[in-house]
Amino acid sequence: MNEDDGYTFVATLFCSTDGPNSSPAHYYLKNPDGTLYLDIHNEGNDLSRDSLLDGKIFVYYWNGLSYAFFCKRPEAGKPIEVRVGDEWKTLESSAHIQIDSTGKFLQQYYTYVPRGEEGERLPLDFYPSPKADPAKKITLIQDSFGRGFFIRDVQGEWMKIQGIDYNALPDSEEVIEEEEWAKVSKASEVNPIYWVRWREGRKILIYISEFVYKYSV
């Protein structure tokens, strides 16, 4: 897959009504022919909900303040091409649309927490390098606490992960702040590194709900 397959970057739309930095009242998501596909607008400090996006974009309404689309590399003076399901749509560039590489976006904001009951095999195959070599496949089993992983890198269809040292987490029910996550990340560096295939072409192999936002309770 090449760099413009639409999964190498993430475009995040923000909702803010704070003074001069307030976001636009509307983000117009358009079809390739320029016709309107969806008007995403502010509704009482939240972005509007619509079934046209449900299950079709990477981040949809986890807090109502931002949505995130996989997108192509943006080009100056041109609309941003974003994925909605298997289709391409466009968004006009805005200071309130943040573009990150997929790797940076996932490393900064998310952990990978796979589903599974205690004693069950985790859903993906794990490898020591970004290559599906059957002879080197590693099977991991869910433990009593529930395994979680830091996302260390993304290379195309492969994601580099490392187990979270939950003993290093603060004993609190409050939101874990960035500085605290940095300490946990450092403590976790002694844990094994694995590679998993997070997508295959257009098919995402990880349930979106298994990408867990770091800064929520």
Descriptions of predicted regions:
Residues 1-35, 49-120, 133-136, 156, ...:
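Boundary regions of SH3-family modules and the immediately adjacent low-complexity/disordered segments
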Residues 130:
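Active-site environment of non-heme Fe oxygenases that use a 2-His-1-carboxylate facial triad
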Residues 143-149:
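Loop/turn positions that initiate beta-strands
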